[in-house]
């Protein structure tokens, strides 16, 4: 069920904190959605570093998107990463159950309890301690309708309340309560990164573009900085 952004009230926020996710109206008009889609289709297909794109930086700091993030993280939150996800007939993949455990940082620096490290699209990524991830928020803005037929996100409510889970723990985790997050064009899925989530290949391949923005409200330990702070 989609909830209008104006109904983002404490009672509904409490439900989000319990479940770890919510589907809401992103508050973007059709013109803004069209312009955003056209920009990404022509200039930034498959982009992993979206916050390097001026229009996406403007979107992330807009009042419309901050109206979604601030009730969860507070008024001092900021965007730290942006990714474009799309499933098409040519790129129609399955994503196994997992948590989002890595952050993008400016440079590598050895921090106790942090690791492993990797480089994706030229950017340093690291798994921090779970307290960093648990206080973050993902805002997934849908540029196309998305349902079970074209690879919609599936989630396990409440699973974000656990620490990092191993592969075997994820495989054994009860998933009877798992649900599909159907979303319409213009909807946003708000999600805690530690929430167990997955997606299946699209049964009916069609464009399923999602602008995935990650927000945080905490500075990182001395010696390491966010790649972006928008």
Set out the residue ranges of the language-model regions.
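Charged, cofactor-coupling segments
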Residues: 222-230
